[in-house]
UniProtKB/Swiss-Prot annotation:
Catalysed reaction equations from the record: N(7)-methyl-GTP + H2O = N(7)-methyl-GMP + diphosphate + H(+)
Biological process according to GO: nucleotide metabolic process
Organism annotation: Alkalilimnicola ehrlichii (strain ATCC BAA-1101 / DSM 17681 / MLHE-1)
Lineage of the organism: Bacteria, Pseudomonadati, Pseudomonadota, Gammaproteobacteria, Chromatiales
Site feature: Important for substrate specificity: 15, 73, 157
Catalytic residues identified in the record: 72 (proton acceptor)
Protein's name according to its UniProt entry: 7-methyl-GTP pyrophosphatase
Length: 199
């Protein structure tokens, strides 16, 4: 079997790293230094796609030999983009807004292999229908889970599932921040063996 090229995750997210570890993809994490500001009136779809590409390209410039994965996510409620709350008060506010509503999570993913001249990217949507949440439930959840670094103010891999009525989408991993099924498509197109000897 041909030796796999290095795989780099252009992120400091422990959630994305954990997903790659679960599927036994040996990788290195190198955070990309890119401006993550959203352009005025930039649609959420375009925003996450642009950032996923920018993160992968930034790291690929330093490591052209590697397959570099970039990813970014936004939560959208109506026309409003919900970012990472950063504080308990903001997390409670976001969850109160999402109560009884459908929030669409858009996750951009990009794979860049500069040496091979390959660039692939896509956006994977995933919809979460929230239960009607009372103030006490929201406060307890935020205090216990501390979802301050998560778009939409919850962790679906933890207690966050108690907040949901139902979920819709092709890849539940997209909700955690890295759509593995689409990523596998990209890696296979680059000739990267997904199941092979671990280093």
């Amino acid at each position: 079997m041909a030796e796999r090229p290095p795989l780099i995750l252009a992120s400091r997210s422990p959630y994305r790293r954990a997903l790659l570890e679960q599927v036994r993809l040996p990788h290195e994490a190198i955070p990309a230094d890119v401006d993550e500001s959203r352009h005025p009136d930039e649609p959420a779809h375009d925003y996450v796609l642009r950032l996923a590409r920018a993160k992968a390209e930034a790291v690929a410039e330093r490591r052209p030999d590697a397959l570099v994965i970039g990813s970014d996510q936004a939560a959208v409620l109506g026309e409003r983009v919900l970012g990472k709350p950063g504080s308990e008060a903001r997390a409670r506010e976001q969850l109160a807004t999402a109560s009884g509503q459908c929030v669409t999570f858009l996750t951009g993913v990009a794979v860049v292999h500069a040496a091979g001249g390959r660039r692939q990217s896509d956006v994977v949507p995933y919809r979460v229908h929230f239960r009607d949440l009372d103030e006490t439930t929201i406060a307890r959840y935020v205090a216990l889970e501390q979802p301050l670094d998560c778009a939409g103010s919850f962790k679906s891999e933890g207690l966050g599932a108690v907040l949901f009525q139902r979920m819709e989408g092709s890849d539940p991993n997209a909700l955690i921040g890295l759509p593995l099924i689409r990523l596998f498509d990209f890696l296979l197109a680059c000739g990267y063996p997904l199941i092979g000897s671990e280093e």
